[in-house]
Design a protein with these regions (language model features):
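Helix-interface capping motifs at the ends of transmembrane segments in multi-pass membrane proteins
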Residues: 103-123, 163-166, 291-329, 342, ...
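Alpha-helical transmembrane segments of multi-pass membrane proteins
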Residues: 95-114, 128, 132, 154-155, ...
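Basic, amphipathic juxtamembrane/active-site segments
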Residues: 206, 213, 223-224, 380-401, ...
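Membrane-embedded transport module
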Residues: 303, 334, 341-343, 587-638, ...
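Cytosolic catalytic regions of ATP/NTP-dependent phosphoryl-transfer enzymes
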Residues: 239-247, 363-537, 543, 556-557, ...
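Non-lumenal N-terminal regulatory segments of integral membrane proteins
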Residues: 1-180, 185-193, 198-206, 210-217, ...
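Soluble-to-membrane junctions at the N-terminal ends of transmembrane alpha-helices
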Residues: 78-110, 143, 230-239, 270-298, ...
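Hydrophobic alpha-helical transmembrane segments
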Residues: 115, 123-154, 161, 277-372, ...
């Protein structure tokens, strides 16, 4: 029961700061019912005539004006899900309190109060208050910072609004939370559906609804109303729902519901209540913390039995065991985790890296393989139209003009190639083409066909279909070519000629796109994919995208950091290999998409580990490669910004996208780069490792210190005629130690700790406890001997002196361990802690030494230590530090150091 509560708490700890977009968990709601009234409303909207729609939402084809928008927003609220609404401060305070560690301390405090140990109860209450308030303050600051970070990468929608008092309208790009029912929006490939919509116009619109239905294949949406065959609104052709994604095509649609009134909004509360599988970070924190709690639950009864049996005072033994249990409870862990992750996220933002999901920071630091596309990552992402040629490689204005018509009139997702074509055509030619040719229709791009077409007309008698796309996909639908001004069959001779010319262009680092046309009699009705047949290959347009100057040094830096870079691209293998050569990346043997389809998972997994460059890949190829690399034990990052990258982004341990990416890519990513650069990424990786290293410090310190303390207590309890330390001493010591840990998130990290990927290793933690825990016990036992034989504190009458002596040694050694374990180097000489941590530990040590001499000493049942004690104290601490350093050197040589 307790483990279940604890695991749930750890799983949701980071998500309270930066809410994960609910989409990834939504597929769990396939069989979750929504209110019947919502289903009925959606079914009604699906078949409602368009004229009635305008009246229902008090809108019109020209769009809403500002007054109408404000009225609608006042009525329906902002377009935000319930999970995105901020909770009141008292709810946050309660959430910060109700972690398992505080609950455990509260129970122990209640027992102390019931047994009339009011001082112990007060100290425990103070510990709980400090832990809760520090966590609350840190989360409040982190939430504010996280909101600012999220605002930097917010999604937008293109909406039709009245823009002035004259009633003129225009298309505006606004944040999706500003949409209101009645708005008219545009949709294109790659867009996330921002609200529940009724389709008004659509061209080959295919939407992925897997997030709501679990169906992997996209479904077509149309503006044609018909009575639904089923009572499930998700199957209505005229409706699109928030959280789904446009795969291909274009559309105009009316917003019919926003925020928690949407289908997804009704499910959001239930989605958030359902448990998702914990990731590696959450599992690691959970395992470590449960290890410490189990250790406490086992050792406290053992301490009780030994003290009760040897001393005969079971009441005092129970209080002492209770205090030991308090000391073994890692109550500061939630604050340390929260503070470290949040501070890391803020620091990453200064490196132009926005963390959407805080627990992704650990994977960022653990990443050992980075899969990335070529375009814009290795290259400048400033594509220039270099050539426009016929099939023989001769410059052709006809090919350029055909490409311009295609790029100018297509309304889908305009990529950099379209922009380069439009910019590469002179203004006079562009004006002439626009005046002569009118658009009739278009067949949008999709990643299955890898081409797109527009249909244009110069007169009323004929239409011309202009198609451009990947060379092989265009050749698949061509039967003829234009050669020396004549149309000839596409035979083997021509295919060899085409391959020779395009290979030459590819070897020059040029990306080749084929252009084909087809003349058709003018007709009514829409054009379909089937019309892309028997085309005439006109020629090619070739683009240059030179490598960035920063790519080569960034690749070297990533390699030095232990990260292997693999290129996963849809481009030609010749172009990709040329770019890899220019940036100093050894491509080796190139694997292409068609080869992958013939391989089993085991074969591809082995091949993927030794291959650097994959070319001509589909989105599913990329996803499969990433999944298999993960299966082999790698922590895999994937960097992409296109629709075709979304499956791989979701499959990766850490999805990385850029601010200018399509909506679906940004939604799927864990981390957003404000600058598409491997150098920025490398800096982010290093910061991620620093964050993880500081979090690991607290866990290692706590684990080893607790192990040593319990061992010392057991030895003392077995042989001393009195308690080695009173319960309140243990509580005060633990309280002071907690204070010294507050500054750990601000600590420095040695360079060698960030030179390689860092991962959770529970086995290493257990080994670390066994190695370093008993060291403090050795010097604790020496202290027992010192107080017993040198200072003759060996009777119940002199036990206060004994307890005061061990109180100071225990507190100082426990505080010094912070400096000893934070680095593999020699502390204070080769590696210094940050000033905040140094100041906090010095203050705690001074307070610890001063307490036996202070006016509080009698109340705390401590006594002033003789001056002769302090040379021994220095010797014990020096010996402790020396032995720890020697063991640390052996340990790091044998097992390494995280």
């Amino acid at each position: 029961m307790f483990k279940e509560i604890f695991t749930r708490f750890i799983r949701h700890l980071p998500s309270r700061l930066v809410h994960r977009d609910p989409l990834p968990g939504a597929q769990q709601t396939v069989n979750t019912a929504v209110p019947p009234s919502l289903s009925a409303h959606c079914l009604k909207m699906a078949v409602m005539p368009e004229e009635e729609l305008w009246k229902t939402f008090d809108t019109h084809p020209e769009g809403l004006n500002q007054a109408e928008v404000e009225s609608a927003r006042e009525q329906h609220g902002e377009n935000k899900l319930p999970a995105q609404q901020p909770s009141p401060w008292w709810v946050h305070l309660w959430v910060c309190y109700r972690n398992p560690f505080n609950i455990l301390l509260t129970i122990l405090g209640a027992i102390s109060y019931a047994t009339e140990d009011l001082f112990a109860a007060g100290v425990i209450a103070l510990m709980v208050a400090i832990s809760t308030l520090l966590n609350f303050i840190q989360e409040a600051r982190s939430t504010k910072a996280a909101d600012a970070l999220k605002a930097m990468v917010s999604n937008t929608a293109t909406v039709l609004r009245v823009i002035n008092d004259k009633g003129e309208n225009g298309w505006l790009e606004i944040p999706i939370d500003q949409l209101v029912p009645g708005d008219i929006i545009k949709l294109a490939a790659g867009d996330m559906i921002p609200a529940d919509l009724r389709i008004l116009q659509a061209r080959d619109l295919f939407v992925a609804q897997a997030s709501l239905t679990g169906e992997s294949l996209p479904v077509e949406k149309t503006a044609t109303t018909r009575q639904p065959e089923h009572s499930n609104p998700l199957e209505c052709d005229t409706l699109c729902f928030m959280g789904t994604t446009v795969v291909s095509g274009t559309a105009q649609a009316m917003v019919i519901a926003t925020g928690d009134n949407t289908w997804f909004g009704q499910l959001a509360g239930r989605v958030s209540e359902q448990e998702s599988e914990p990731n590696a970070f959450q599992q690691g924190i959970s395992r470590v913390s449960m290890l410490l709690i189990r250790f406490m639950l086992v050792m406290a009864p053992v301490v009780l039995l030994i003290n009760g049996y040897t001393k005969g005072d079971w009441w005092e033994a129970a209080l002492f065991a209770l205090s030991v249990a308090v000391g073994l409870t890692p109550e500061m862990l939630p604050m340390i985790v929260t503070s470290t992750l949040a501070r890391g996220a803020v620091k990453l933002s200064k490196q132009k890296v926005i963390v959407k999901h805080l627990d992704a920071i650990q994977n960022f630091g653990a990443m050992d393989i980075l899969c990335t596309d070529k375009t814009g990552t290795l290259t400048q992402d400033k594509i220039v139209l270099e050539n426009h040629t016929d099939i023989s490689g001769k410059t052709s204005e006809r090919v350029l003009h055909s490409a311009w018509l295609n790029s100018h009139y297509q309304t889908g997702l305009k990529n950099l190639l379209d922009t380069a074509v439009l910019e590469g055509t002179d203004e006079e030619s562009a004006r002439s083409l626009a005046s002569r040719w009118q658009k009739i229709d278009e067949i949008p791009f999709d990643f299955e066909r890898r081409r797109m077409s527009v249909v244009v007309a110069e007169n009323t008698e004929h239409h011309q279909l202009v198609c451009k796309g990947a060379l092989q996909e265009i050749l698949n639908v061509c039967s003829q070519v234009r050669h020396n001004g004549e149309i000839v069959p596409l035979d083997d001779i021509m295919l060899r000629k085409i391959k020779r010319v395009t290979d030459t262009l590819n070897r020059q680092g040029l990306r080749v796109v084929a252009v084909a046309t087809k003349y058709l009699p003018a007709r009514e009705g829409d054009y379909q994919r089937a019309d892309e047949s028997d085309l005439i290959l006109e020629g090619y347009i070739a683009f240059l995208d030179p490598p960035k100057e920063t790519t080569a040094p960034a690749l070297k830096a990533l390699k030095a950091s232990g990260i292997t870079v693999k290129i996963l691209t849809g481009d030609s293998e010749l172009v990709a290999a040329k770019v890899c050569h220019e940036v100093g990346l050894d491509a080796g043997e190139v694997v292409i998409g068609s080869d992958i389809e013939t391989l089993s998972d085991d074969e591809l997994a082995n091949l993927a580990q030794r291959t650097t460059l994959f070319a001509r890949l589909t989105p599913m190829h990329k996803e499969r490669i990433v999944t298999l690399l993960k299966r082999e034990g790698h922590v895999v990052g994937f960097m992409g910004d296109g629709i075709n990258d979304a499956p791989a982004l979701r499959a990766a341990d850490i999805g990385i996208s850029v601010d200018g990416a399509v909506d679906i890519a940004r939604e799927a990513a864990d981390i957003i780069l404000l600058e598409k650069s491997l150098m920025v990424l490398e800096e982010g990786v290093i910061e991620g490792r620093r964050t993880f290293a500081n979090m690991l410090k607290y866990i290692k310190m706590t684990a080893s210190s607790n192990f040593g303390n319990v061992f010392s207590v057991l030895v003392a309890s077995a042989f001393l005629p009195f308690l080695p330390m009173l319960p309140l001493h243990l509580l005060i010591q633990n309280l002071l130690y907690d204070v010294s840990q507050v500054a750990i998130p601000f600590d420095n990290v040695d360079d060698e700790q960030i030179q390689k990927p860092q991962r959770w290793n529970p086995a290493d933690l257990g080994r670390f406890m066994i190695f370093f825990g008993p060291i403090s016990s050795i010097f604790d036992i020496l202290t027992f001997c010192l107080m017993w034989w040198v200072f003759h504190a060996n009777t119940p009458e002199t036990q206060t002196l004994f307890q005061s002596g061990w109180f100071v040694v225990g507190l100082l050694s426990q505080t010094l361990i912070v400096h000893m374990i934070r680095t593999r180097r020699v502390p204070f000489i080769q590696s210094c802690a940050s000033w905040p941590l140094m100041i906090m530990t010095v203050i705690v040590m001074i307070v610890g030494i001063a307490l036996p001499f202070s006016p509080l000493a009698s109340y705390l049942q401590l006594q002033a230590l003789p001056l002769s004690y302090f040379p021994w104290l220095v010797a014990i601490l020096a010996g402790y530090m020396t032995l720890t350093q020697l063991v640390k050197g052996f340990y790091s040589r044998r097992y390494g150091w995280q």
